[in-house]
Amino acid sequence: MPQERLGALRRLLREKPYIRVMEAHNGLTARIVETVSAESEGQTRSFDAMWVSSLCDSTAKGKPDIELVDFSSRVETIQQIMEVSTKPIILDGDTGGLVEHLVFHVRTLERLGVSAIIIEDKVGLKKNSLFGTD
């Protein structure tokens, strides 16, 4: 299953002019993204993939979004999401952390079946751009 999920995002991007992605930060929100659909003009539309946001993951854990939630905790969140969903996952990787750790993190995410990781092009302490603190 991880290998199927890993390539699913790439297939979607080849096959569709755009894809619908919704944030999920735990099993419940993943289940909602997995099952929700809407009918419009005779077509049923649903989400194609999930965005696992560091902001939402941190907030759900009662922590600030400053990379305080460690990688092991992020992996646990991803595993909870994967238990209830088959959709591709795009992970918010923040600044990527230490370069020495990034290779390990990417390999772990590949083994899990995460389709993409987004790394911010910033240096220094993580600051959430949604709060106007860049």
Language-model features: where?
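Glycine-rich anion/phosphate-binding loops
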Residues: M22-L28, V69-E76, G93-L112
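Glycine-rich, proline-tolerant flexible connector loops at the mouths of alpha/beta enzymes
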Residues: S37-S73, G96-V99, I118-D134
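Short coil/turn connectors at secondary-structure junctions
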Residues: E15-Y18, T44-D48, S85-K87, L112-S115
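N-terminal amphipathic alpha-helix/helix-capping segment at the start of soluble metabolic enzymes
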Residues: M1-E23, G27-S40
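Glycine/charged-rich beta-loop-alpha catalytic/anionic-binding loops adjacent to active sites
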Residues: L13-R14, T59-P64, K87
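Hydrophobic faces of well-ordered beta-strands that scaffold small-molecule active sites
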Residues: R20-N26, M50-V52, I89-G93, I117-I119
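Alpha-helix-loop-beta-strand connector modules within alpha/beta enzyme cores
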Residues: E4-G7, P64-L91, L112, G132-D134
